[in-house]
């Protein structure tokens, strides 16, 4: 079984207290947080049908956590291709286009001589010192592009955000632009993150290649190493246009990627890089590994695991692995393995084909840099403008877009695969699931004469969380854990009445989107639905606002929800609210109406 986030440690009293007594807390079970360097164990599906369902969810999960569910509008690329340099057997040009309005993707286009149609390859570079210009014995991005072009492929190498011609945006926190860091908790609320932007850039890079008349649109591959390997397998998982994939030195069960651009908040709550890569099956996948990095066990561990996924399709010959005796790399031996793989699957070469690399000499940097001798075009957005444009576009989609996708995005933000169905109530009288610190509320509940289970929320260790790199990629936030705890409580008690106040009241409304709640009394503590600051303070869950937050949850909830203490900044269409604070007398009246004594 997969090593995963321990099951929600919601701990409840095992029996109902007598009337007039205070429901007893239980001691919450402590647990170990997940990290990017845990050893993950792959859980394999029992059947192809089961895997198709899981793979579809994972594909959607990548998009949702990346802020791409619903998918952003594919606005015009406005591509500019210029500065072509012609060599004997290939050409290279400078390229920029807009993946979002005013947000540029920059890179180089390498083409074979001739008119095509040619197969094509998108080639993200990874965390080499010189990005797409890296040209060393360890890795050469222009070297692989030149050789692939000579072999008859159109190749687009493009910058990761913050590298080379994209340098006006920072790649990691601490590298500032306009005196602020790019990305952060507010951006996370809206699904705007570095990894998601780079995934979108990769998707739009495929759009760019498809727009070229010389490209065979049904024969597009992807390859990159290190962080470029992460970009490769994420793109390959979500974009059906990728016909062959070769992530290099990245697929591992004991290191999931060390950069912010590989760690989308919420992505790996219950998955790992092997399973994410397996979503590509049964399309042809080459796993290139090295003896000197975290892929050193590929031939004994990750490759056999991947073969089992391909076996479900009867397509074991569509996955292959090689291990190079070297440290972390995309060196000549690794590149030659990729050349052969792409030749086989994109050009119809025999399975035993060998393709040797030819000597190459990249053009001087000024001839490859997009903005070496021309100014940045007018209209390029700053990080602040990018954030505000992203939020405005998200609001438009929430107002008139695909509501099914929005609802799915909420489930992904909360870390659940699907809405649960209602179970049968176990007794003639409902059970109360109680989450309050208000003694008056507890006394009112006790007077109702109903069985009570008081939620003991999983403790959140903020100090331990802060010490874990990319914590939110692998673990729920404190608010997210509260929601999960309530979902578990309600799932175990069909027909229960939920009573919750304060932050638990907010979590209760979100839980009602996941598990059927027939009746709930929620005090939301005058929460301001219009304020990002309020979400950051009381309900920080990455992707929550991108998915319509509590408004989407209320639309998904099917029971009778009574919302109190809403104030004047808590308006949800179709949901009645009460401005006043919830009182014990009101609770008692409702409980008697709903089945109390």
Predicted regions and their residues:
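Bacterial N-terminal signal peptides
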Residues: 6-16
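Alpha/beta-hydrolase-fold serine-hydrolase catalytic core, especially in secreted/extracellular enzymes
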Residues: 20-104, 281, 288-451, 458-494, ...
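Cap/lid segment of the alpha/beta-hydrolase catalytic domain
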Residues: 113-211, 250-261, 434-492, 527-538
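Alpha-helix capping and helix-loop boundary segments enriched in small/acidic/polar residues
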Residues: 133-140, 174-178, 189-200, 222-233, ...
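Primarily recognizes the serine-hydrolase "nucleophile elbow" in alpha/beta-hydrolase
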Residues: 204-269, 489-555
């Amino acid at each position: 079984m997969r090593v995963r986030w321990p099951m929600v440690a919601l701990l409840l009293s095992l029996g109902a207290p007598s009337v007039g007594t205070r429901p007893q807390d239980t001691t919450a079970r402590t647990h170990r947080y997940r990290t990017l360097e845990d050893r993950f164990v792959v859980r394999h599906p029992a059947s192809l049908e089961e895997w198709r369902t899981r793979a579809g969810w994972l594909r959607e999960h990548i998009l949702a956590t990346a802020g791409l569910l619903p998918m952003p509008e594919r606005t015009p690329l406005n591509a500019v291709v210029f500065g072509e340099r012609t060599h004997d057997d290939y050409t290279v040009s400078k390229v920029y286009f807009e993946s979002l309005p005013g947000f540029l993707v920059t890179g180089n286009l390498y083409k074979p001589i001739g008119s095509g149609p040619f197969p094509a390859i998108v080639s993200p570079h990874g965390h080499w010192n010189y990005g797409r210009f890296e040209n060393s014995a360890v890795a050469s991005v222009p070297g692989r592009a030149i050789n692939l072009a000579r072999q008859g492929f159109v190749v687009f190498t493009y910058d990761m955000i913050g590298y080379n011609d994209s340098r006006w945006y920072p790649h990691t926190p601490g590298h500032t632009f306009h005196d602020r860091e790019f990305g952060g908790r507010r951006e996370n609320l809206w699904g705007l993150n570095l990894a998601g932007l780079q995934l979108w850039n990769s998707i739009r890079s495929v759009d760019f290649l498809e727009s070229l008349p010389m490209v065979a649109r049904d024969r597009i591959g992807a390859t990159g190493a290190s962080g470029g390997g992460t970009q490769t397998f994420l793109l390959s998982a979500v974009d059906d246009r990728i016909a062959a994939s070769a992530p290099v030195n990245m697929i591992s069960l004991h290191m999931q990627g060390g950069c912010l651009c590989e760690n989308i908040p919420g992505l790996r709550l219950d998955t790992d890089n092997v399973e994410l890569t397996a979503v590509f099956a049964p399309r042809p996948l080459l796993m290139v590994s090295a003896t000197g990095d975290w892929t050193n066990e590929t031939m004994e561990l990750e490759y056999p695991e991947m073969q089992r996924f391909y076996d479900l399709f009867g397509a074991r010959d569509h996955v292959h692995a090689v291990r190079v005796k070297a440290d972390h790399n995309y060196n000549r031996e690794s590149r030659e393995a990729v050349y052969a793989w792409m030749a086989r699957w994109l050009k119809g070469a025999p399975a035993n084909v060998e393709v040797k690399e030819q000597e190459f000499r990249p053009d001087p940097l000024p001839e490859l840099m997009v903005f070496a001798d021309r100014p940045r075009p007018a209209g390029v957005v700053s990080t602040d403008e990018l954030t505000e444009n992203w939020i405005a576009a998200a609001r438009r989609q929430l107002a008139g877009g695909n509501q099914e996708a929005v609802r799915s995005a909420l489930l992904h933000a909360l870390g659940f695969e699907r809405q649960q169905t209602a179970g049968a109530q176990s007794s003639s009288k409902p059970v109360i699931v109680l989450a309050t610190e208000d003694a008056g509320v507890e006394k009112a509940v006790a007077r109702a004469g109903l069985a009570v289970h008081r939620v003991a929320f999983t403790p959140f260790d903020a100090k331990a969380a802060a010490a874990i790199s990319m914590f939110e990629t692998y673990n729920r936030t404190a608010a997210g854990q509260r929601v999960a705890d309530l979902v578990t409580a309600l799932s175990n008690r069909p027909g229960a009445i939920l009573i919750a106040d304060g932050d638990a009241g907010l979590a209760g409304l979100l839980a009602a989107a996941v598990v059927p709640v027939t009746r709930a009394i929620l005090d939301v503590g005058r929460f301001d639905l219009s304020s990002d600051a309020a979400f950051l303070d009381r309900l920080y869950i990455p992707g929550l606002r991108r998915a319509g937050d509590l408004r989407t949850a209320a639309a998904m909830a099917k029971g009778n929800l009574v919302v109190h203490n809403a104030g004047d900044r808590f308006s949800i269409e179709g949901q009645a609210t009460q401005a006043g604070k919830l009182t014990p007398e009101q609770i008692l009246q409702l409980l008697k109406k709903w089945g109390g004594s």
